Structure formats: structure tokens, C-alpha cells
Amino acid sequence: MESQQLSQNSPNLHGSAYASVTSKEVPSNQDPLAVSASNLPEFDRDSTKVNSQQETTPGTSAVPENHHHVSPQPASVPPPQNGQYQQHGMMTPNKAMASNWAHYQQPSMMTCSHYQTSPAYYQPDPHYPLPQYIPPLSTSSPDPIDLKNQHSEIPQAKTKVGNNVLPPHTLTSEENFSTWVKFYIRFLKNSNLGDIIPNDQGEIKRQMTYEEHAYIYNTFQAFAPFHLLPTWVKQILEINYADILTVLCKSVSKMQTNNQELKDWIALANLEYDGSTSADTFEITVSTIIQRLKENNINVSDRLACQLILKGLSGDFKYLRNQYRTKTNMKLSQLFAEIQLIYDENKIMNLNKPSQYKQHSEYKNVSRTSPNTTNTKVTTRNYQRTNSSKPRAAKAHNIATSSKFSRVNNDHINESTVSSQYLSDDNELSLRPATERI
């Protein structure tokens, strides 16, 4: 009876995987399910009775035929060799494009949970085939790498890698992220990954491989706990938890903004104005710097701006320092207006200076030449020169000679007036005065 009942319930027993489990060796030419219940041990009979009372699982057709029956208990899966990443070979950019894995996207074969934090640095497994761009962090010498096995299409980095690369420090607060990311970027460059890091314009030299992507992701999450990241970084990682390069690209852009802020502060503190440029240009320059700082949430008060401007004034604008020294309520617009007023006054004075000098020079030229003088070289045949055309030294000599001659010979000339007239009448000669000698 018992064997007949077992044969009638054989389909159900075959469908239940646990009903046929034994620890004995079964001949390969005999189906273990065909063994009669009388040959089974007592504990097997009890398990048969318990399992026969359970609900039937899928039919016989759902169980594959297996001549060597194996226990269907779930096998324990061994842990991955590389921590939370699966072991993969080196993926070239061509293979990445062929597998529809685009740059900056989350790869489908990267099996890691959503941004898990790790207190320690990620140590690669020695059995994992790491590429040569990842230097060892231990003091032991790295294993030699066979360059012949490297794929020819993999672009090699040009930077030199040292034996040891110091890892970045762990992020301690959200406010220190901008400082921490500088050390992290330097760490990647020292790891020979500088050609896949975005530059100031957001450009990269080459596409990263899967192993490089996994390495960057793992090191980033190891040293930057998620709860200490800024809000804008969390928003990027919530959309794509592995998009670390976008975070680095925006971080570089923010660093450029911070550098511009520093440059603006330096330019504002070193303002100088002496009137060599127009007052409008100076006002536009200062207003642009202040507006740029305001866009970066840095407000510059009018009092501070006026003090920095007054410190750099020189020349005719320097007296404004004393005027504003006692003022408590300084207005930047009022200071610009006074600078403009002084600049306009100086401009008018500079325009009038050339015309005054021109009139003065013309007056000098007119006073030196008499308008009644004529060119005696052309009109007179005896080539007599006028007193105005003679040099000053000749004039002085002639005047001195004539005065002396007149004093000595004045009486003699008066006495010989009759004789001179007689000669003049006879010979038609005229005596020239001594002053007319050449």
C-alpha cells in the first residue's frame, strides 16, 4: 500500500525539489526518484511525509532532467575580487563606443550602490589587472607590467608618475570643499590621469576608460563623505552618482570665479588716478569691478570704495583726500562727480595754453621788425643799410663814433661851412656825414 501510494504521488514528489534530497551515493544508471520508500532511512521517510503534505510546486516539466541529481539548495556566491566593483578587462575608447557607453554617463556594468561612503582609502586587489596609470600607494615596489600586453589603442598619459602618490585628505566640512577639490585634482594628476580632467574651458584631451571611471568614482567617494558635500554636488550625484567629472568641471569653473574675485579685490585696492585717462573711463572701470563682486555675493560699501579711490588719487585730484577726511557719509556718486569736475577744468586749461603761447610769439616777432622798413638792397644803388637792418653791435659802434666825432669837430665844421659851400658850388660835390660811413 505504501509503495502504491508513493507511486501515485510520484509527480508531486518529483516536482518538489527537497523530497528527493539524500546524502547517499546513488548509482548513475538508476533514477533516485524511482527508489522505493522502504529502502529509505527513517529520517528520509519523515521528510517525505512532511514534503508530501505541502503544496505542489511547478510541474515536472519545470524541472530540467538531470541524470546526476544535485541538491538544489542555493549556492553561496563568492565575494567579488575587487571590492564593490566587478572584475573587467581594460576597455578602450573604441570598445566603449561600440558598447554604447557614452562619456560622462553611468556605465551599466558598474555594480555599486548609491554613493556609499568609505572611511578608508580604496586599496585595489593584487589579482585585479590594474592599468599602469594607477600608481601604488604602498611603499612596496609595484609588480612589473608587461607593455606588450597593453592594447595599442589605449592613449598613454604623458605625465611622469612617481613611485608613491600621496592621497588627498578627507573632506571635513562643506565649506572646505573648494579647497579639498584642489588637492583631489592634484592627486589625479599625480596618478597620471591629468589628460581626462576637464580644463578651465571644460575640455578634455581624451575619453576615460571604464577602469579609470571606476577608479575616480571610488577614490572620490572614499575621501568625500556624501553628507559633507555642497548642495550643488549632491544634486549632480543624485541624478548620476558616478558623474564625478561633471563635479570636477564645475569645481574648476568655480575656482576660476574665485580667482577672479581675488583679482578684483587686488585691482580695487591698487586703484590709481592722476587724470591721464578720462574720468568717465575711470568711473566705468571701478563700477565694473564693484558690480562683478556684487554678483558673487560680495558687497562693497560706498565708504570702503571711496577710501580705496581716495588713496590712489594724485596730482590735482590729491586735495580731495583732505576734503573727504572729515566726512562720515561718503557717496561714491558724489566722489565721481567731483573727479569729473576737476578733470574738465584741467582739460579746459590745457586747451587754452597753446593759443596763449601762439599769440605771445607773434607779438615778439612784430616788435622786432618795423613795418616801415624796406629792402634797401634792392631799391638803393649805393647799398646803404638802414639802422634797423644793421646788427646791434654795428649800431652801437656807429653811435659811439658819431657822438665823438661831433664833439671834437663841431667847431671845425662850423668854420669850414663857407669853404664847403664853395667846393659844392664848383665841383658839385656833397660831403657825407661821418655817421654814414660803411
From Swiss-Prot:
Residue segments, region Disordered: 1-88, 360-403, 418-438
InterPro entries, A to Z: TYA
Keywords: Cytoplasm, RNA-binding, Transposable element
Entry's Gene Ontology cellular component terms: cytoplasm
Ranges of compositional bias, category Polar residues: 1-39, 49-60
GO MF term list: RNA binding
Biased composition (Low complexity): 369-382
Site (Cleavage): 397-398
Biological process, per Gene Ontology: viral translational frameshifting
Localization (cell): Cytoplasm
Keyword Electron transport annotated: no
Span list, region RNA-binding: 295-397
Coarse class of the protein's main subcellular location: cytoplasm
Cytoplasm found in the keyword field: yes
Pfam families reported for this sequence: TYA
Misc. remarks from the entry: Retrotransposons are mobile genetic entities that are able to replicate via an RNA intermediate and a reverse transcription step. In contrast to retroviruses, retrotransposons are non-infectious, lack an envelope and remain intracellular. Ty2 retrotransposons belong to the copia elements (pseudoviridae).
Subunit structure: Homotrimer.
Free-text comment about domains: The C-terminal RNA-binding region of CA is sufficient for all its nucleocapsid-like chaperone activities.
Summary of the function given for this chain in its UniProt record: Capsid protein (CA) is the structural component of the virus-like particle (VLP), forming the shell that encapsulates the retrotransposons dimeric RNA genome. The particles are assembled from trimer-clustered units and there are holes in the capsid shells that allow for the diffusion of macromolecules. CA also has nucleocapsid-like chaperone activity, promoting primer tRNA(i)-Met annealing to the multipartite primer-binding site (PBS), dimerization of Ty2 RNA and initiation of reverse transcription.
UniProt protein name: Transposon Ty2-DR1 Gag polyprotein
Upper lineage: Eukaryota, Fungi, Dikarya, Ascomycota, Saccharomycotina
